[in-house]
C-alpha cells in the first residue's frame, strides 16, 4: 500500500501532562497548550490536519473537517528524555530510567575522564547550558579545561570554545566519555556543546553532536534495514540511535535545514523511512523558557508544512509527533512528562479520524512494521487499519 513513511518529530512539542507527571515534578505542564495560550500563535496548516482536535488550543480551533488521523500518545517508558522518547517511537521500552546526576558526576568518573583526555575539567554540576558558559567560559578559554555539566536528564555534556578545543578534538573527548560511562553510569547521551565568542558574548554553535547508547534490542529501523528498505536519518536521529539501523543521514543543525533536508530526501528516497528530528523547539526555546521563540518556531514549521504536503503521493504516509514536552511557561528549564501529538496523513485517506489516546509511542513502530510487512514489533499496536483508506 505505502512505499514510504515520512516521520517527523517536533522535539519537545508535548500536549499536556501525563497521569504520572507528578512523579517527575511536571504537574500542570502543557507545552503546546500553554504556548498557544500565551502567544495566540495561529497554526492553520496543522489545524487543517486536526491539531486543534487533539486538545483544546486557544489559537488553533477544533476542525470538524480535519483531513488526517489525530490523537495523542502516552509514554510507557520510565523517563522523559530524548533517547527514551525516540527509542519508544522506534519500538523499544526503557523500564529502568537512565541514571541522572543532580549533584554532578562521581569523582571516579571525573578522574578517569581527566586522565584519559589529559586535561582537568570545570563545572561538574547540573546547569543551564547558556548559563554555565557565561559562568565558566572565560576560565575555560584561559585554561583550556572543558566544561562538564548535566541536567535533569541523563546527559553528560561537554562545552568547549571552538578556538580552544577544535570540534574534532571535542568530539574525540566525548567519545572517550561515552566509553567511560557504562554499566551503572550508562547515561543516555554524551553531548558535545561547542560555543564561540568572547567573555560576556559567548554563543553556542550549531555543531552540537550527540553520542548515544546503542539500542539494546532491534528497533523498527533495524527491521527495515535488514529487509532492504532505506532508513534516512535527518537531524540528530542518527546520533540518538548510535547509527544503528540507519542507511543514510543528513546531520542538519536547525529546523529550517531539517525541513529542507526532508523535502530533498523525498525527491531522492522512494522506498523506506525518512525519519526527521526538528530540534529548535527544545534546544533553543523550551530549555530557555523562551515562549515567543517557541511560538515563532511552531509558526515557521506550520508555514513550511505545505512544502512537505505537496510532495506526498498516494504511496506515502506522513506521521508528525513529538518525543516529550519542554514547557517554556513553567519555572523548570527541563523536559516535561507529557502526552505527545499524533498526526497521520496520506492522500489516500478519505477523511479525518480520531485515533484516540494511544498507550505507547511504540504504536508508531507497530504501524510502520505493518506498512512495510516487517516485524512484528515487540511493543505497540498498529493504527494502520484505523485509517480510512
From Swiss-Prot:
Main localization (coarse): cytoplasm
Subcellular location: Cytoplasm
EC assignment: 5.4.2.7
GO terms, molecular function: magnesium ion binding; manganese ion binding; phosphopentomutase activity
Catalytic activity, reaction form: 2-deoxy-alpha-D-ribose 1-phosphate = 2-deoxy-D-ribose 5-phosphate; alpha-D-ribose 1-phosphate = D-ribose 5-phosphate
Top EC class of this enzyme: isomerase
Keywords, in A-Z order: Cytoplasm, Isomerase, Manganese, Metal-binding
Pathway: Carbohydrate degradation; 2-deoxy-D-ribose 1-phosphate degradation; D-glyceraldehyde 3-phosphate and acetaldehyde from 2-deoxy-alpha-D-ribose 1-phosphate: step 1/2
Entry similarity comment: Belongs to the phosphopentomutase family.
Protein known as: Phosphopentomutase
Lineage start: Bacteria, Bacillati, Bacillota, Clostridia, Thermoanaerobacterales
Amino acid at each position: 500500500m505505502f512505499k514510504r513513511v515520512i516521520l517527523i518529530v517536533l522535539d519537545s512539542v508535548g500536549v499536556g501532562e501525563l497521569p504520572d507527571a507528578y512523579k517527575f515534578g511536571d504537574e500542570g505542564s502543557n507545552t503546546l497548550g500553554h504556548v498557544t495560550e500565551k502567544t495566540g500563535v495561529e497554526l492553520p496548516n496543522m489545524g487543517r490536519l486536526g491539531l486543534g482536535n487533539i486538545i483544546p488550543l486557544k489559537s488553533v480551533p477544533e476542525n470538524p473537517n480535519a483531513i488526517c488521523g489525530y490523537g495523542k500518545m502516552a509514554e510507557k517508558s520510565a523517563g522523559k528524555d530524548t533517547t527514551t522518547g525516540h527509542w519508544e517511537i522506534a519500538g523499544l521500552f526503557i523500564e529502568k530510567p537512565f541514571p541522572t546526576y543532580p549533584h554532578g558526576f562521581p569523582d571516579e568518573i571525573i578522574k578517569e575522564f581527566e586522565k584519559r583526555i589529559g586535561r582537568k575539567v570545570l563545572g561538574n554540576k547540573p546547569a543551564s547550558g547558556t548559563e554555565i558558559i557565561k559562568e565558566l567560559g572565560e576560565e575555560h578559554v584561559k585554561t583550556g579545561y572543558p566544561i562538564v555539566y548535566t541536567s535533569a536528564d541523563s546527559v553528560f555534556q561537554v562545552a568547549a570554545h571552538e578556538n580552544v578545543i577544535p570540534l574534532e578534538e571535542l568530539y574525540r573527548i566525548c567519545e572517550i566519555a561515552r566509553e567511560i560511562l557504562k554499566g551503572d553510569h550508562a547515561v543516555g547521551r554524551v553531548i558535545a556543546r561547542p560555543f564561540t565568542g568572547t567573555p560576556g558574548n559567548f554563543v553556542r554553535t550549531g555543531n552540537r553532536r550527540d553520542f548515544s547508547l546503542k539500542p539494546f534490542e532491534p528497533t523498527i529501523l533495524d527491521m527495515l534495514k535488514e529487509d532492504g528498505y532505506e532508513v534516512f536519518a535527518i537531524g540528530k536521529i542518527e546520533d540518538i540511535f548510535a547509527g544503528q539501523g540507519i542507511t543514510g543521514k543528513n546531520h542538519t543543525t536547525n529546523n529550517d535545514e531539517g525541513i529542507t533536508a526532508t523535502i530533498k530526501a523525498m525527491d531522492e528516497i522512494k522506498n523506506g523511512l525518512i525519519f526527521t528530528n526538528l530540534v529548535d523547539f527544545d534546544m533553543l526555546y523550551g530549555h530557555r523558557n523562551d515562549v515567543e521563540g517557541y511560538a515563532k518556531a511552531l509558526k515557521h514549521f506550520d508555514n513550511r508544512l505545505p512544502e512537505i504536503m505537496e510532495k506526498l503521493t498516494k504511496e506515502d504516509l506522513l506521521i508528525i509527533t513529538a518525543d516529550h514536552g519542554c514547557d517554556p511557561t513553567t519555572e523548570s528549564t527541563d523536559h516535561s512528562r507529557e502526552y505527545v501529538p499524533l498526526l497521520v496523513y496520506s492522500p489516500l485517506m478519505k477523511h479525518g479520524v480520531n485515533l484516540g489516546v494511544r498507550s505507547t509511542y511504540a504504536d508508531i513502530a507497530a504501524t510502520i512494521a505493518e506498512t512495510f510487512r516487517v516485524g512484528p514489533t515487540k511493543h505497540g499496536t498498529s493504527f494502520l487499519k484505523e485509517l480510512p483508506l
